[in-house]
């Protein structure tokens, strides 16, 4: 049974329930998880250029009608780059930290700029940076992100949108991806874009998910989940994205979520999830990365790659349940059980 398909993305994200994103965050930074999901404190995320491009491509490809609800078109053609972008983002961060709930700012711009200059990495003096900043597109961009980020919008430029449209066109015409992204509703296929499901359980823990694309094939009697990723390195997706961002957690939860959400289709097979990976610069061809029996087993049980251990969903959920039950976030389950004594072998 499909649940939550009509909620807006904002309403979906407001649902207090773990997801693959929060589970990944717990596994990599439990302090941030504790602040965001237990204490309900606001944690600002720094968007990379690739992640913004990914959301743009996803929206233009699957939900173009929602563009204005997710993005704000900047009046500048090009956003600041390199150290100036770092300076602008640092300005925003320190401005936000100095702003109370009524919108009053407790620090002067000069004080905020001094801290932003330190964070940005600029080697030139602050006066020289401000000479480049004041009256420039960078200042306009700074004012825009201050205005719209509080509304849940992402600032993008016309160049960003043009590039995203090029990527969408590539996905629609590439031999590997076109048969997937161009699928439309028919007697044979049911297509669900940005499918929201909630309330499914894995190892007794309740989750929600928003799946980019789910295709139900009534002829083959299969259910296929797709997730779109936009990265700087399509060919090296496995190491530079899948492992780094622990996307195997997402793949496993999506698989389990799809099985439970479509349980009424008793004679249908839920296939392992696939990642559609496109190049955020639109140079390399998109590739499709498929989960296998081995990778799904690794996703659940954990695995080692090049000497580094990656915890599986089973362990991560067990650790999270322990932390919640004991309200203990400053030590791992294993080290607590060992009375904070760690043996070095």
Q: How does the language model describe each region?
A:
Residues 93-96, 100-102, 106, 113, ...:
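Metal-dependent nuclease catalytic regions and adjoining charged, substrate-binding loops involved
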Residues 189-192, 197-248:
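Non-catalytic protein-protein interaction segments used by genome-maintenance enzymes to assemble
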Residues 61-66, 215, 230-233, 259-263:
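Hydrophobic/aromatic-lined pockets within catalytic cores
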Residues 57, 211, 254:
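Single, functionally critical "micro-switch" positions that shape active/binding sites
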Residues 169-178, 216-218, 256-263:
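Short regulatory "switch" loops immediately downstream of catalytic or recognition motifs
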Residues 69-70, 234-236, 283-285:
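Short catalytic/ligand-binding loop motif for oxyanion handling, primarily in non-cytosolic enzymes
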Residues 1-208:
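Metal-dependent nuclease catalytic cores that hydrolyze phosphodiester bonds in DNA/RNA
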Residues 185-187, 215-223, 259-269:
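Secondary-structure boundary elements
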């Amino acid at each position: 049974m499909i649940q939550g398909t009509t909620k807006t993305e904002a309403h979906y994200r407001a649902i207090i329930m773990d997801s693959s994103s929060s589970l990944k965050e717990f596994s990599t930074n439990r302090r941030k998880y504790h602040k965001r999901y237990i204490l309900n404190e606001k944690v600002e995320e720094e968007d990379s250029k690739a992640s913004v491009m990914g959301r743009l491509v996803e929206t233009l490809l699957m939900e173009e009608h929602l563009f204005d609800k997710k993005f704000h078109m900047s009046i500048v053609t090009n956003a600041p780059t390199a150290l100036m972008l770092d300076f602008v983002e640092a300005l925003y961060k320190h401005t936000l930290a100095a702003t109370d709930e009524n919108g009053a700012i407790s620090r002067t711009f000069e004080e905020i700029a001094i801290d932003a200059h330190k964070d940005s990495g600029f080697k030139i003096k602050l006066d020289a940076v401000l000479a480049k900043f004041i009256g420039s597109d960078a200042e306009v961009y700074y004012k825009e992100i201050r205005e719209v980020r509080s509304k849940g919008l992402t600032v993008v430029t016309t160049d960003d949108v043009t590039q995203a449209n090029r990527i969408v066109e590539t996905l629609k015409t590439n031999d590997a991806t076109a048969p997937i992204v161009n699928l439309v509703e028919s007697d044979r296929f049911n297509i669900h874009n940005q499918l929201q499901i909630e309330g499914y359980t894995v190892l007794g823990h309740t989750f929600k998910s928003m799946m980019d694309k789910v295709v139900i094939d009534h002829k083959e009697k299969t259910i296929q989940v797709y997730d779109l990723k936009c990265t700087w390195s399509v060919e090296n997706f496995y190491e530079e994205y899948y492992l780094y961002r622990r996307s195997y957690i997402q793949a496993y939860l999506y698989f389990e979520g799809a099985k439970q959400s479509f349980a009424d289709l008793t004679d249908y097979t839920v296939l392992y999830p696939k990642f559609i990976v496109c190049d955020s610069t639109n140079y390399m061809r998109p590739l499709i990365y498929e989960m296998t029996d081995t990778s799904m087993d690794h996703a659940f049980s954990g695995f080692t790659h090049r000497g580094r251990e990656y915890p599986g969903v089973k362990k991560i959920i067990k650790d999270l349940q322990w932390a919640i039950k004991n309200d203990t976030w400053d030590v791992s389950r294993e080290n607590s059980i060992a009375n904070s004594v760690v043996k070095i072998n």
